[in-house]
């Protein structure tokens, strides 16, 4: 694929022009407080370049999964407030997306200023499966840019969505790839076509079903796949072990067994924990103990025990594998890192990545939130992706609509 770049757009001149920018402001909130502003900070460079060049910038973004109508808890107000605190330019939030407030504020926008339009998912047409409905919403967004507008997609976390603000606007305006999207694609390309070996992939998170396609595509490409998180218990069950009350997707056991066989034939090694931390219940203060992974029901909690983290022996083994790698991709926490008693595995993986002499990539979503929650800085890793689902779909080999539509 070949894309028009942000630098090309700026070289053509943007002063006084309305530039529609799809940003990723989908940040976690605690009430009205942003708890992780990583995506907001990642959006700043493109917005700053454009405002420095005199553009009038209209930002579209989503937050959460509202049901096609305004919901206060999904308002972009907290994200826009944090953006304004961080930005060297003026930021205003419209009271709607394409209504009277958006039109009034857009008309009043001055060179070098930013207007954040309210959550695009407050309009059901944004995510519609009907091309005409999405197109009509895209037309209304585009109309805010006037006669000489342009579109910049800088929301890598949304490029796997065929949504109006990602896909359809790009068919209606001269369109450019934002610097963040460019960086993300270049990083992921190194994980698929220019990979230095050994290549170690760390997969966690709760469900193996969420990772099936990426696992399928990594067999024969990755040298080693380290399995943690809730998904590890389906791997243990596939090997004939009982997992007590731990998360288990029984319908995926045959799939995992097939993967294990194929991986052995293809030269990819799956490494499953040899010990796990088992708790009496899912709670921060739950009684817990470490047991062998093949004897989970032998814990003090019997068949009611719940595995909530990989054990220290497994964490050390995973860390050694990571430190021996030249390329590492990590997606998904090893345990319930939000509870300190069950954060040990995730912390060990993060620390190993910071110490590895390797190109290290932390997948977006929970993994990015985990490293920041546990006190690690972004610059301790080679790259922290802003796109969880988008990163996985890229590694699955899928075509991403938000990228393909930018291909010139």
From Swiss-Prot:
Gene Ontology MF terms: ADP binding; ATP binding; phosphoglycerate kinase activity
Annotated positions binding ATP: 211, 307, 338, 364-367
One annotated Gene Ontology cellular component of this protein: cytosol
One Pfam family in the UniProt entry: PGK
Known EC number: 2.7.2.3
Catalysed reaction equations from the record: (2R)-3-phosphoglycerate + ATP = (2R)-3-phospho-glyceroyl phosphate + ADP
Keywords: ATP-binding, Cytoplasm, Glycolysis, Kinase, Nucleotide-binding, Transferase
InterPro entries on file: Phosphoglycerate_kinase, Phosphoglycerate_kinase_N, Phosphoglycerate_kinase_sf
Binding site for substrate: 24-26, 39, 62-65, 121, 161
Domain of life assignment: Bacteria
Pathway(s) per entry: Carbohydrate degradation; glycolysis; pyruvate from D-glyceraldehyde 3-phosphate: step 2/5
Protein location: Cytoplasm
Gene Ontology process terms (BP): gluconeogenesis; glycolytic process
Family classification: Belongs to the phosphoglycerate kinase family.
Quaternary structure note: Monomer.
Name of this chain's protein: Phosphoglycerate kinase
Gene this protein is translated from: pgk
